[in-house]
Each structure stands twice: as structure tokens, then as C-alpha cells.
A protein has these predicted regions:
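Acidic/histidine-rich helix-loop elements
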Residues: 4-26, 81-89, 111-119, 209-218
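Active-site environment of divalent metal-dependent phosphoester hydrolases
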Residues: 12-15, 51-56, 79-84, 110-113, ...
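N-terminal active-site segment of His-dependent metallophosphoesterases
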Residues: 1-60, 130-131, 147
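A short C-terminal boundary segment appended to hydrolase-like catalytic domains
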Residues: 226-246
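Active-site neighborhood of phospho(di)ester-bond hydrolases with catalytic His/Asp-centered motifs
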Residues: 5-7, 42-48, 72-78, 106, ...
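Active-site-proximal beta-strand elements of phosphoester/diester hydrolases
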Residues: 2-13, 99-109, 137-141, 196-203, ...
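Conserved beta-sheet core of the metallophosphoesterase superfamily
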Residues: 153-226
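Binuclear metal-dependent hydrolase catalytic cores centered on His/Asp/Glu-rich metal-binding motifs
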Residues: 97-137, 150-166, 218
């Protein structure tokens, strides 16, 4: 089973609109073209689909993702409008990935850059894990770990301790995927005597400078995506970068 993660395309209604380092629509086009060549079995897009929160930006994203040769799923980030997303493509909270499954969490706090699950969503997560012991990936927008950039760590998942506590009773959780940070991250979290892999993904748009105290764009880094191979032995992963001719 080959899963690809795309994150943070930050599209505008105007496909020619520029970001700090390029044209987000063209960047996402290039990323999707590269992902098609990966022949994935599924794709997950971990939030911040839109920069301007326009209906047109979600329609443009959905048209691009519909060119993928496989099912695709998305979840909201802090910049997103759930209703506009759902109007273009269903929002789901769980999908089967062969012998694995993936849970998609909504960490959005309306009007705020940070994320939070809260008691209700954490209880729902525990209930989903109680009902199914298949190897499980969890995808969410906000990092549930510190990524090492002070300004980004201040706007991550606020209730990350409660999140990891909720996972502690469920050894079927093998890995967690996040967006938001616009940079590669790979680490582990000790969770009830085992280690859970945690992965961040390069954005499909601008990249952020790793380990920065304050907001800074990494103008030298290209957009990218993450590939995960899921099998009976576990999950292996790699990151690919995409050169965009603009």
C-alpha cells in the first residue's frame, strides 16, 4: 500500500496569484504531476488548502486532486473553511488502506492559528481506536510535537499531551502525519513503552526555515511531498522535492 501525503498548498481564487517564493497553483500542479508518477494507492492532503478561503480555491484544488489515479482525502487546516471544502469533496474521519487504516483529525480552532482537539474529539478518537485494532496512521494538520522553530511551536497542537495520552492505550497506532510546519520533520514519541513515528511534510507551496526563532521562509527549498509504504512489517517513508519552473 503506497500512501502519499501532500500538505499546505495555500491556493488563491486567482491561479496566477503569487506567494513569497512562487505561484501556489503552479507549485501544486507540479507536485500533483510528480505524485501521479508515484502510482499511489491513496493520497491524503493535510490542510491549508486555501490561502484566501475562497470557494474558487477549493474548486481548483479539487480539480487537480481529481486527476490523481487513486482515492484522495483532505482535512482542514487553520486557513480553511470546512463548508467550502465539503462542497467540493467529502470530509471523512477514517479510511481503509489495505490492511491498515487512517484516521483524519480536525484540529482547527476557528479564527486561530494554533490547533486543538478538545475533550469531545479526543473521546471520539479513543472510541475509533477501541473499535478496530488494525495498524493505524493518524493524519492531522497541526504538529503534536515541537518541530524546533519557536514561532511554529507556539501555534502547534495545544492539547498535544492529551492527544498522546489518548493514544497510550492503543498500540495499533504506528505513525502520525502532520502539516502546518512547511518543513520536513521525522521523529518518534515515547508512548506507553513504545515509540510512535511522527512525520512532517514539506509544503506544496512556500517552505519555512527550520529551527527559526521567528517566521522565516526558506527560499532555497522546493515544494515536496511524502511517500509512505505500508505493509505487514510497518511503514517506511521518504520525502521527494519538486522543481517548479516559473
Amino acid at each position: 500500500m503506497r500512501l502519499v501525503q501532500i500538505t499546505d498548498p495555500h491556493l488563491h481564487a486567482d491561479p496566477a496569484a503569487r506567494s513569497r517564493t512562487g505561484i501556489p497553483f503552479a507549485q501544486l500542479q507540479a507536485v500533483v504531476a510528480a505524485v501521479i508518477d508515484e502510482r499511489p494507492d491513496a493520497v491524503v492532503v493535510t490542510g491549508d488548502i486555501s490561502q484566501d478561503e475562497s470557494a474558487a480555491s477549493y474548486a481548483a484544488a479539487a480539480r487537480l486532486f481529481d486527476t490523481l489515479p487513486c482515492p484522495w482525502h483532505w482535512l482542514p487546516g487553520n486557513h480553511d473553511q470546512r463548508e467550502l471544502m465539503a462542497a467540493e469533496h467529502e470530509l471523512v474521519d477514517a479510511v481503509a488502506l489495505g490492511d491498515w487504516r487512517m484516521l483524519l483529525l480536525d484540529t482547527q480552532v476557528p479564527g486561530a492559528p494554533h490547533g486543538e482537539l478538545g475533550e469531545h474529539k479526543l473521546a471520539a478518537l479513543a472510541a475509533q481506536l477501541e473499535d478496530d485494532d488494525r495498524p493505524t496512521l493518524i493524519a492531522l494538520h497541526h504538529p503534536p510535537v515541537a518541530v524546533g522553530a519557536d514561532w511554529m511551536d507556539a501555534i502547534g497542537l495545544k492539547d498535544s499531551a492529551a492527544f498522546w495520552q489518548a493514544l497510550s492505550a492503543y498500540p495499533q497506532v504506528k505513525a502520525v502525519l502532520f502539516g502546518h510546519a512547511h518543513q520536513v520533520f521525522s521523529g518518534t514519541v515515547a508512548c506507553a513503552g513504545r515509540e510512535v513515528d511522527v512525520y512532517g511534510c514539506p509544503a506544496a507551496a512556500d517552505q519555512f526555515l527550520p529551527d527559526a526563532e521567528h517566521f522565516a521562509v526558506d527560499a532555497e527549498a522546493s515544494p515536496g511531498y511524502r511517500v509512505l509504504t505500508l505493509d505487514a512489517q510497518g511503514a517506511s517513508t521518504r520525502v521527494e522535492r519538486v522543481k517548479v519552473a516559473i
